[in-house]
Regions:
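N-terminal signal-anchor/initial transmembrane insertion module
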Residues: 1-116, 228-237, 241
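Aromatic- and histidine-enriched alpha-helix N-cap/loop-to-helix transition segments
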Residues: 58, 151, 219-222
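Multipass alpha-helical transmembrane domains of eukaryotic endomembrane proteins
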Residues: 94-211, 230-237
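C-terminal transmembrane module of eukaryotic multi-pass membrane proteins
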Residues: 166-301
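Conserved small/polar residues in nucleotide/adenosyl-binding loops
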Residues: 306-308
Length: 308
């Protein structure tokens, strides 16, 4: 029994010198990046600075993973989410970046335990990171690393949030909401459907497997729940803004002095309109590139939800 286990481990793409080198190099890179920024741009003993430092590794990882996912996202969109036409780039991109992500998860727990232990939540920190380390290594072992890298585009909202946390002037709830809904809801739903097809179940190159589909669909309810909370939060924020504007209008009418800059109000309206157009264009692109059978199935599912 142990001989078979050892033989399987030796044959696994996880147990190679290249993977070990990538992991060590990535760990060293995160160490240098964190300490370089923590001791310069984000130095200081204030609580606000500590909160900013806790987002250094997450923001850096999210940016790198998003950029690395683009070749796979492009191929999926171009070929209607057909995995048979997606070049995996396993050795040159998918496997190294998967290990890079594992190194981030380990680094965040390691350096977080040293520098910002009280900011590491048990569920979203220890449980989440540990579970993803195991999942990524298993997907790498099964030859599914390129599918994981395609899903890494869902790190865009994490990067947007990280930038906003480290630089409050750049914080944008609109940008976060747009990227979250377009990647973790729309793109994720299309990814789930694609992994249920024969080509999707054969992404490992050997036997067909439902495991990638099951893994992706298990995470989806969490994204839907987060999206629900996000929409509710935006609705409350929008209601508050309307109340503030109504109060400002009353004060303006009473005093006869304009309290808001008309040019600024117009710029805000144009910004909201641009965000709506970007989101609508992304949804239309995903919908138009999906096969007809998928669109029909998704439409039927939406109708069934409406009638519940």
């Amino acid at each position: 029994m142990w001989d078979r286990v050892l033989a399987a481990a030796e044959a696994s793409p996880v147990c190679t010198e290249a993977v070990a080198r990538t992991f060590v190099t990535s760990m060293a890179g995160f160490f240098v990046a964190y300490h370089a920024l923590a001791l310069s741009v984000f130095r200081g003993g204030a609580k606000e600075q500590l909160n900013k430092r806790s987002w250094i590794l997450t923001t850096l990882s999210a940016l790198c993973m998003t950029l690395a996912s683009l070749p796979y996202v492009y191929q999926l969109l171009r070929h209607g989410f057909h995995w048979g036409h997606v070049d995996p780039y396993r050795e040159s991109l998918a496997e190294p970046m998967s290990i890079f992500f594992v190194a981030y998860l380990v680094s965040d727990l390691l350096w977080g335990s040293v520098y910002y232990r009280h900011l590491i939540n048990f569920t979203s920190g220890w449980v989440h990171h540990s579970a993803y380390v195991l999942m990524v290594l298993y997907w790498l072992h099964r030859g599914w690393s390129h599918a994981f890298m395609a899903a890494a585009v869902m790190e865009i909202p994490t990067w947007v949030m990280g930038i906003g946390r480290m630089s409050p002037k750049l914080r944008s709830f609109r940008a976060f909401t747009t990227t979250f809904l377009s990647t973790r809801i729309v793109f994720h739903a299309a990814l789930i459907v694609s992994l249920s097809t024969e080509a999707g179940r054969g992404i490992g190159g050997e036997s067909l497997s439902w495991q990638p589909f099951i893994s992706s669909i298990c995470v989806f309810p969490m994204h839907v729940f987060w999206a629900y909370k996000l929409v509710r939060s935006n609705m409350r924020r929008h209601k508050k803004r309307l109340e503030e504007r109504a109060a400002a209008s009353c004060a303006e009418a009473a005093s006869g002095v304009p309290l808001r800059d008309p040019a600024k109000s117009e710029a805000e309206r144009e910004g909201r309109a641009r965000a709506h157009r970007v989101l609508a264009a992304a949804v239309r692109k995903l919908w138009s590139t999906a096969p007809e059978a998928w669109r029909k199935a998704y439409a039927e599912e939406l109708l069934s939800l409406i009638h519940i």
